[in-house]
């Protein structure tokens, strides 16, 4: 059987000499892995993580790993390799997708979200965009946070907390008696114009980290590329 789609290469590992297994996040078919062969400089350039490709997957049976053929559409390597903030954000993003999405599970809308994020990242690293990516990833995996209004009073002002139980924002008045048990809601997530302080970066990463750990990172397992991104971001403010 054949699968033809557009995709982003999110992993590549050696199988034997000049032969690799690539994992591709495709628009209409989710994650697919296939065997590719590299016999030229051109093919080595094509099979790089982050490349957008035309993807052809062929196998006798659907459950087989299959062979893959790819044609390059766009490469981001040159945009990320010389900028650590961009590179670490990129590595974190594709590692999270590889970790949290199941093979052959469609995420077509999120695929478009990823392409838009990579385009923006190629131009400029933005911490707000990165956190919004993690929030979107949580939502895509079934754990959406509602930060638009207070989960109790429904007011839309003075929101400074997030309930770890309901994943909803809470106003100052509602949350004050329980503040030691609540997560902080970074101000920049409520306004596109606000400057982002180091403390707000810590709050934002603690917010998404809590829900990743509670629902998705089992047995306290962490994504190494994400940890590298966090350490770099908090130490290079």
Swiss-Prot record:
InterPro entries: ARFGAP/RecO, DNA_rep/recomb_RecO_N, NA-bd_OB-fold, RecO, RecO_C. Involved in DNA repair and RecF pathway recombination. The keyword Plastid does not apply. One of its GO terms (biological process) is DNA recombination. This is DNA repair protein RecO. Belongs to the RecO family. It comes from the Bacteria. The keyword Hydrolase does not apply. It comes from Rickettsia peacockii (strain Rustic). Keywords: DNA damage, DNA recombination, DNA repair. HAMAP family: RecO. Gene3D superfamilies: Nucleic acid-binding proteins, Recombination protein O, C-terminal domain. Pfam families: RecO_C, RecO_N. GO terms for cellular component: bacterial nucleoid.
């Amino acid at each position: 059987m054949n699968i033809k789609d557009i995709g982003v290469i999110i992993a590549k590992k050696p199988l034997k000499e000049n032969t690799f297994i690539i994992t591709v996040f495709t628009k209409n078919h989710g994650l697919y892995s296939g065997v590719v062969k590299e016999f030229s400089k051109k093919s080595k350039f094509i099979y790089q993580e982050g490349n957008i490709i035309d993807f052809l997957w062929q196998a006798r049976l659907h459950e087989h790993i299959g062979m893959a053929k790819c044609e390059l559409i766009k490469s981001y390597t040159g945009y990320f390799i010389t900028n650590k903030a961009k590179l670490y954000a990129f590595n974190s993003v594709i590692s999270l997708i590889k970790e949290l999405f199941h093979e052959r599970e469609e995420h077509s809308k999120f695929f478009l979200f990823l392409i838009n994020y990579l385009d923006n990242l190629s131009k400029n690293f933005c911490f707000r965009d990165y956190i919004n990516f993690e929030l979107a990833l949580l939502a895509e995996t079934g754990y959406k946070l509602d930060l638009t209004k207070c989960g109790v009073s429904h007011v839309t002002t003075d929101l400074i907390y997030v309930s770890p139980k309901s994943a909803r924002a809470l106003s100052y008045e509602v949350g004050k008696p329980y503040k030691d048990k609540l997560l902080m809601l970074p101000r920049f997530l409520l306004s596109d114009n606000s400057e982002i302080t180091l403390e707000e970066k810590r709050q934002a990463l603690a917010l998404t980290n809590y829900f990743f750990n509670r629902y998705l990172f089992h047995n306290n397992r962490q994504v190494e590329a994400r940890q590298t991104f966090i350490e770099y971001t908090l130490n290079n403010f």
